[in-house]
UniProtKB/Swiss-Prot annotation:
This is Bcl-2-like protein 12. GO terms for biological process: apoptotic process; negative regulation of apoptotic process; negative regulation of cellular senescence; negative regulation of intrinsic apoptotic signaling pathway in response to DNA damage by p53 class mediator; positive regulation of transcription by RNA polymerase II. The keyword Ribosomal protein does not apply. The modification Omega-N-methylarginine is found at R60. Keywords: Apoptosis, Methylation, Phosphoprotein. A motif (BH2) lies at residues 227-238.
Length: 250
């Protein structure tokens, strides 16, 4: 994937994620927000908050590289060849589709793998964190406020531990989920799309916790970039996995 094309897709993904976070707040389920000093106040704009989670070259004020001046200009019609930029309504529609997928996934309990005894103390802590993240934002806030040690473990996770946290959070017991006919053709690969939706849900649940956790969650969402690109970008994904208008989410 060309560098400029990848950066453009990552920017689109950030906008989808910002719209997804905005849906959660509008629905009355704000992300966890531990107390901060005035010097630690986060920007209220979701997109700005997400960019602060990324390395400078990918998020905070990265200056676009200057293109060399062309020697000639192509002769082509000025209409009908390339789509215009996506609108806020488009990102909101993608976020709505992802929200529907999240609701479908969360109807199923966590994987039976979580029922057995943990093999290590580290695994036990990660399972405890997953159980915490299954709660509503208000409950997460209350438990983290009463257990600073647990919050410290959560915001200081290593990348390897976070990868395991993602694996546990996204593992669902498919046997308990009723089958439901979806309108239109099925998505090109339902499992990656469902995992991507859950990755955004995890980002929503940890977005206000600070530390390295928010950045790791956003980078995990960006790890789906090759898959998104292979299926025609967000436009292609929405075209083959449309919003189910029979689910009144708004």
């Amino acid at each position: 994937m060309a560098g400029s094309e990848e950066l453009g897709l990552r920017e689109d993904t950030l906008r989808v994620l910002a719209a997804f976070l905005r849906r959660g707040e509008a629905a009355g389920s704000p992300v966890p927000t531990p107390p901060r000093s005035p010097a630690q106040e986060e920007p209220t704009d979701f997109l700005s908050r997400l960019r602060r989670c990324l390395p400078c070259s990918l998020g905070r004020g990265a200056a676009p590289s200057e293109s060399p001046r062309p020697c000639s200009l192509p002769i082509r019609p000025c209409y009908g060849l390339e789509p215009g930029p996506a609108t806020p309504d488009f990102y909101a529609l993608v976020a709505q589709r992802l929200e529907q997928l999240v609701q479908e996934q969360l109807k199923s309990p966590p994987s039976p793998e979580l029922q057995g005894p943990p093999s290590t103390e580290k695994e036990a802590i990660l399972r405890r964190l997953v159980a915490l993240l299954e709660e509503e934002a208000e409950v997460i806030n209350q438990k983290l406020a009463s257990d600073p040690a647990l919050r410290s473990k959560l915001v200081r996770l290593s990348s390897d531990s976070f990868a395991r946290l993602v694996e546990l959070f996204c593992s669902r017991d498919d046997s308990s989920r009723p089958s439901r006919a979806c309108p239109g053709p099925p998505p090109p690969s339902p499992e990656p799309l469902a995992r991507l939706a859950l990755a955004m849900e995890l980002s929503r649940r940890v977005a206000g916790l600070g530390g390295t956790l928010a950045g790791l969650s956003v980078e995990h969402v960006h790890s789906f970039t090759p898959w998104i690109q292979a299926h025609g970008g967000w436009e292609g994904i929405l075209a083959v996995s449309p919003v189910d208008l029979n689910l009144p989410l708004d």
